[in-house]
């Protein structure tokens, strides 16, 4: 059996303004078989997604400039089938409900690890 090529790997857009967290989670997700693209904020994430909408997205709620909620809405407009997990260090029921209404499939409170993210993406 041949190892999966990048074309066979599911695409994942990881958006978080915390560079250290972003790098660690990106490496962990790559080891779990995802083709990961990262972005530090909403404008950079949209630039990537408009070129190729991701199959999966992991989006931080609080980032400089626009909120992750704005990004969720725009990602769903690009491709309604994108599975999105919202991450936040500021968990609240109201925000979780808003994220789900906008199209997120799951909501996780930080700190999280890659196994939790994979489980949420696959629910």
Language model: regions and residue ranges:
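The feature encodes the CheY-like receiver
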Residues: 22, 64, 88, 92
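Charged docking surfaces used in two-component/phosphorelay signaling
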Residues: 23-31
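Short amphipathic alpha-helix used as the core "switch/output" element in two-component signaling
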Residues: 47, 69-81, 98
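Active-site beta3 strand of CheY-like receiver
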Residues: 52-58, 63
């Amino acid at each position: 059996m041949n190892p999966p090529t990048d074309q066979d790997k599911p695409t994942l857009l990881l958006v978080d303004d915390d560079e250290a967290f972003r790098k660690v989670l990106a490496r962990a997700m790559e080891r779990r078989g995802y083709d990961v693209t990262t972005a530090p904020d909403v404008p950079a994430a949209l630039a990537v997604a408009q070129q190729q909408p991701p199959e999966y997205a992991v989006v931080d709620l609080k980032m400089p400039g626009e909120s992750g909620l704005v990004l969720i809405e725009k990602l769903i407009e690009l491709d309604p089938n994108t599975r999105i997990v919202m991450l936040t260090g500021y968990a609240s029921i109201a925000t979780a409900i808003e994220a789900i209404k906008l199209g997120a499939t799951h909501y996780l409170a930080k700190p999280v690890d890659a196994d939790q993210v994979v489980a949420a993406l696959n629910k």
